[in-house]
């Protein structure tokens, strides 16, 4: 809620009007090892364009220390939201406050993109996995996007950079307009509303609704990744 958002801004000493990026490099060790380097390169480019840039990075306890080590040299060192020592409810509220404080997010593709849509945080998705894994996935999964927001909405409004296309300059260029009242930001807000409507505000549990929506989208769009 508003109280949690105000408390987070105060605890992180974020000045009014300061641009805030939410960085979500993943929750598994392999993901953060692959992503923190290129995420840091994106942050360096954004810091040149957006004076006073702040970065918030929610993480999970299992990778909190590796994340801290891998991000300490970023041009704008992130404020890491470490859940260790907090109750699950408090940690979750703090994470959602981070979503609300941010102007835009850089996220590894996954279920977190649906959470960002629910929070109304515009995003760019970027992901790297082992090349062999990527090759196998491309052979088996015939969809044109790995982003759940795009998949459920039936669009490509969330910019997505996978594997060799995950190049920091391109990602920074896609993120930059999301920090202002741009057409790109407005388009994401419209898509987020469609996604939330598709998932439904009532009825089955959220995870089941999300799974059904994704499966329906996969069935509609049997295209090559």
Regions inferred by a protein language model and the residue ranges of each:
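Nucleotide-activated sugar donor-binding and catalytic core shared by glycosyltransferases
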Residues: 1-225
